[in-house]
Amino acid sequence: MPDYKSTLNLPDTPFPMRGDLAKREPGWVKSWQEKKRYEAIRAAAAGRPKFILHDGPPYANGDIHIGHAVNKILKDIIVKAKTLSGFDAPYVPGWDCHGLPIELQVEKTHGKDIPPAKFRELCRAYAAEQIERQKADFIRLGVLGDWSNPYRTMDFQFEADTLRVLGQIQQAGFLYQGAKPVHWCVDCGSALAEAEVEYEDKNSPAIDVGFAVADRADLARRFDVAAIDTPVQIVIWTTTPWTLPANQAVALHPDFPYTLVRTARGLLVLAESLREAALVRYGLADGAEILAHTTGQMLEGLPLWHPFQDRQVPVIVGEHVTADAGTGAVHTAPGHGLDDYVVGSRYGLKVDNPVGDDGRFYASVPLVGGMSIWQANPLIVETLEASGALLAHEKLLHSYPHCWRHKTPIIFRATRQWFIGMDSAGQDSGVRDQGATLREQAMKAVEATQFFPHWGRARLEAMIRNRPDWCVSRQRNWGVPMPFFTHRETGALHPRTTELLEIVAQRVETAGIEAWFALDPAELLGDDAAHYDKTGHTLDVWFDSGVTHACVLKRRSELAHPADLYLEGSDQHRGWFQSSLLTGCATDGRAPYDALLTHGFVVDGKGHKMSKSKGNVIAPQKVMDQYGADILRLWVATTDYSGELSISDEILKRVVEGYRRIRNTLKFLLANLSDFDPREHAMSVDEWLEIDRYALAMTRRLQGELQRHYDAYEFHFIVQKLQSFCSEDLGGFYLDILKDRLYTSAGDSRARRAAQNALHHLTHALVRWMAPILSFTGEEVWTQLADADDSVFLHTRHVLPEQGGEDELLERWARIRALRAEVQKELETVRVAGAIGSSLQAEVTLHATPSTAALLSSLADDLRFVLITSQARVVGADADRVEVAPSAAKKCDRCWHYRDDVDAHPEHPGLCGRCVSNLFGDGEARRHA
C-alpha cells in the first residue's frame, strides 16, 4: 500500500510547543539590550503623536515585591499598546532616593557616629546600589524603557530643579513657617506626611476629667438658676492624658444643649445627649437631679480651673465638638491637635508644646518633667484621682495613627515647620485662577482629570477637601535641603531669597545637596550673615517625588507636560497623586496629568494580605524563575486590577493553562504558514473562500473591540476575548475546519492559498494584540514572520483588508455555527455510545425547516467540511432535527474521509476521488469552506 503521508501539506515550524519561558526569556532580554531595542523603537516612532505615561518612582530600598511587578507590568502593557496603536510612547523609569529608610539602612551597616557629609555620601551610594538591583528585576519582567538613563531624585540636576520649584511656590505665596501641630514620630525624630501615617488598633486610657468652675455665680447666671454653693465641674473625656499639661481650654459645641446635674459628686455639666451614659459610667445615675439646661454658646468664656495646675482656662465653642462619645466637652490643647489648633487660633490661645523631639516632657514641666509621654499617662491619672478630678477610667481599643515605618504610635506636637497652605490664595502668576486658594485649584484640577476606575475621583476629592496644610519640612540628614536664611529675631526670610535660591540651585547642579550643607552663609550674605540663620530643614520626600513633573517631564526633551497618565497603587491617592497635584497647581495652576489610573493591592488566594509571618508572600523573582515573566504578565492582565489582585500557585497554574491554549494556537498558525510568502502568494479578499472571509470579519470585529479595551485599560477583558477567540472561534471552529483544506489540497491551490492569506492576516493581527501582554512570546512569534533584527514593537497595529457585507456575513455564520453546535452534540452522543470514533466516520442527515434548509443547502457539498463529517445531507422537515449514522464507505488512506469512491481509481489504491483530483488533476472546487 503506498504511503501518502509525504503528499500532505503537514504543519512545519521551529516554533516549539513548550514555551520554556524561564529559560528562553533571559536570551530575549540580552538581545533587546544588545540590539538597543528601546532606542530603535524611539527612532521608529519619531514624529508620531506623543503619549506620556509618567513613572511614579519606587523607593530605592530592597528587592522588588509582587506589588512593584504589578505596577511596572501594567505600565509596560500600556506603553507598548500605545506604541502599537501609532503613538510615540517613551518610558522613562525613575527612583525615589532620599529619606529615612535609606538612613536607617546606612546606620545599620555603618553605625550612627558618622560625620554628616560622609553619611550622605554613604546614603547616595546605597541608593545607587539598590537602584541597580531593582532595575535588573524590572528589565527581567520584560519592561522596555530608557534604563540606561532613568531619573533619580538624588541626581544633581533633579535636586537643583527641586529647589527651583520650592522657590516658585514660595514666590507664589503658598509657603509659610509656623508652629502647628503635626504628625510626629518619636522613633523617626521627625514630622510625618499624611501618606506616612497608617491607622492601627491601640489600647489607650480613656478618662473622664472634671474641670472645676472658677466662678460659680457666673455659672448660675448662665444657667439662670439661684446661687450655687456646691462645687461644679465641666467634665471632659480624653484618650490622651499626657496632653493635659498643655491644656488651654475646654471646648463645647455652640448649639448643643448642656445640662446642669446634681450628683453625689457635686454638680456636673454634661451634654444632654450624653448625660445618661456618662452618669452610668461614673456610677452616679441613681439619685441624679437635673437642675437646668443651656446651650454651649451661653457658657462661652466661663473660667475653669486646670485639674492639676494652678491656672485658669476658658470655655470656648467650636463646631468640631461631636456627640458621638464622651461628654460633649473637649479638652483643648492647641499644641497637640489640629482641631484644637484651629479653634484655639480664633481665641488666641497659647500653642504650648511641652514635649521634645524624643517624646519626653521638657525637664521644666511640673509633675512629668523628663518622663516619656507614655510613662506620664499613669502618673497623670493617679494625680487626677488624688485630686478628685477623675470621674472614670477605663481601657479603650480604638483606631490610632501609627508610623508606617516603625509601626509605633505617633503623636501630634506643635513645632516650627514649613507648610504649603491649602487655603492660601497665593499671588497671581498668570497661570492660576486669581484669588483661588490652592485647595480650590486642586479641586478644580481633580474635576478636569479622567479616572480609571471612575471611583478614584471621589476618593481624591474627599482627601483634598479635608486635608490640612502640607508640612513639607523634615528634620533629616539625607534629603534635599530647604535653603533658606531666616532672620534671628523676626524669623523673616532674607529679602534676597529668590535670588539666593537660584544661586544655591546652580551650585547644587554641580555638586549636589552637599553644596548647601557645606556653604558658609557669609559667602552669599556678606555682613548680613551675622543676622540670619541658615535653616537645617530638609524637604519631605513626597515633595521630591511630587515635583517630577517639573524635574523630569519639563526637563527631558522626549517627554511632555502634562503627562497623559499617572499610574500607581490606590494608596497613592494620598501620596504621589496628591503631592504632584498640589505642586502642579501651585506652580502651573493645573494637575500635571490628564488621567489617573489606580490598581489594587496583591493578596493571596484566600484574599489575605501578604506577610512574611503568614508565609504567604509570593516573590516575583520566584514566579519568573519557575514559570517565566510572560506568565506573571498574563496573570496581571487577566486580573481586574481595579480591586485586589489574588495570586497563589493554583491561580498561576490556571494562568499557565490559558497561556498554553494561546501558544498552541500560535504554533498552528505559524506551522501552516511555513511555505507562504505574502509577496508571492497574496490574494484579494474576493478570491478567498467564504469561511475565510468570515474569519477575517471576526478578526476585524475583534480588533476593534480590543482596541477599545486597550484605550480604556481593560486588560482582563482583552485576555478573556483573546482566549475565547483562540479556543472557540479558532481552535474550536475555524482552524478545526481548515485542517482538511490546508493539509489535503494541492500545495499551491487557490483553496489552500486563500486559507493561508486569511491565516497570515490573522497571525499578524494576533501577535500585535498579545505582544503588549505576552511580550517575550510576541517577539518569539515575530522571528518566524520577519527578519531576526526586526521586532513586533517596531510596528503598529496590523491593517486588515476591508470587505463589504461583513455584518451579513457575521450574522449568517453565527446561525451556521449554532446549527453546527447541535450537530456536534449529537455526534458526541453517538461517539460515547461507541458507534463511531471520530466525526469523520459519521454521515449526518439534517432534517430542517425551510429557512434552515436554505441556509445549510447554500453551502452545498462544503457543508460536510464545516461539520467535519464524511457526508452531510439536508432534507426538508417541519422541525430541525439531526440524525447521525456510521458511514458504510471505505476510509481514504490520505484524507481519512469515508467515501464511496475510495479505490475507484485502480492506479491510486486507497484514495478517494477528491484526493486523486488534488494530487493528479485540477483539484477539488471549494467555494465556502
From Swiss-Prot:
One Pfam family recorded for the sequence: tRNA-synt_1
Gene Ontology cellular-component annotations: cytosol
Cofactor detail note: Binds 1 zinc ion per subunit.
Domain notes: IleRS has two distinct active sites: one for aminoacylation and one for editing. The misactivated valine is translocated from the active site to the editing site, which sterically excludes the correctly activated isoleucine. The single editing site contains two valyl binding pockets, one specific for each substrate (Val-AMP or Val-tRNA(Ile)).
Quaternary context: Monomer.
HAMAP family: Ile_tRNA_synth_type1 (MF_02002)
Family of the protein in this entry: Belongs to the class-I aminoacyl-tRNA synthetase family. IleS type 1 subfamily.
Listed name of the protein: Isoleucine--tRNA ligase
